[in-house]
Amino acid sequence: MAVTVVDPLVEQPDYLPPPPKVVTTPCDPWPRPYFLEDGLRRVKPYHFTYNTNVKQRWRGREILDIFTDEFRDRPKEYYKDAIESGKIQVNGQPFASVTSQVKNGDVISHTLHRHEPPVTGQPIGIVHEDDDLIVINKPAGVPVHPAGRYNYNSVVEIMRAERGHQWNPLPVNRLDRLTSGVMFIGKHKKAAEKLTDQLVGRTVRKEYVARVRGEFPEGDVICEEPILQISPKLGLNRVRASGKSAKTVFKRLAYYLPKLSESGEPQGAGYSIVRCLPLTGRTHQLRVHLQFLGHPITNDPIYANRRVFGANLGKATVDSDDDEDVMTRLSRMGKTEVADAVAYEDEMVEQYNKKKAEKMTGELCDICQTPLYSDPGPHELGIYLHAKKYADADGRWSYETSLPEWALPPKGYEGPTEATPESDPLAIDIAKLQLDDEKPSNEQQAGASDGQQQAATAS
């Protein structure tokens, strides 16, 4: 069954009073200011204070440069005014000027009128629930934890809003914001730790399904290329000899021919539906391995983007000669820009730039004068990657979802409506592979308590 989406909550006042001069803790409005409109879950803007310790890369830098470079969702003029008006402070005190430098041990506070991006209004589906765990079907485009511009529009906060303020969900595995599918939520620490041990111990089999460019080869395709994190800030990972060991088994489920133009010429290369079985859990493992094989996920905003990787989309690239150029292009356009994987051909660049400009509505917020964005399109709400099934290696439990709509046969075509039960390449003792999974990052531990660890995923 699916969790019922809450009705629009209590109306918020049209006017929100300004925050006090010094705010040291984030506000916590309850009930959460959600409302549903045009198929999207929206959050009414609210005042909020971010508090963060100075990062190593910030030390000795001017405060205006830090905010302009690190937080690109607002223009430089906004941050200049926020510093001068005391909305951005250091250790509870206003900065002397926009050129003030920060040092180790400083705590930076930023009080702002927060505008969260809308996410899909699709409810969080419940695959299974008992006294210990909730197994959910995470919608694409919804982050697991509050991060970046997302706070209440996150899995943790949406479920808390539906189940009560005191309820503390403990995510065990983590999916990327753009990825959908099976996720485990612990109801208490012991249950979360038990499943975490299984994930870290590699006794859980994971099955994903992806929609990729072109005609993927038939048969089992095994990719064992190591993966290196090139830029944590940009979320960029690539195949590199100096990276961490990684292994994925792929199996094509279907190939669909491209549409024909009026002249009868094929448009594009068609696409394949691919079963993905990660044997390790590197960040972006499936996305990076599929790119390396020359079949990136069709709408992947990073790894299927010709504006970033060029004509060959990073196929079979193992050297670092173009890393700096790739990072520059990705940073310049923003990894979540409208182009995503659309601007494949040179003639589409102009169209992309037009769409990019249309992201801004031209309107300003009445309270904070922040430029307002238009609603995200379908291509910004997720990618064609879905965690379909998680199963205990010893057969004690198994949870799976149906295929997402984008993986079903298009009209007029025949193809699988469910994943086919081929011989399973994972029918081995996974723990004996001696491939070290990544340890959970700080972000992955954000929803845990008392040192609980979360297992990294391969998405």
Protein language model regions, located:
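Internal amphipathic helical hairpin motif
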Residues: 151-167, 232-234
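Pseudouridine synthases involved in rRNA/tRNA modification
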Residues: 1-77, 81, 236, 241-247, ...
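Short beta-strand segments enriched for Tyr within beta-sheet-rich domains
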Residues: 195, 282-290
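N-terminal accessory regions of nucleic-acid-interacting proteins
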Residues: 183-232, 241
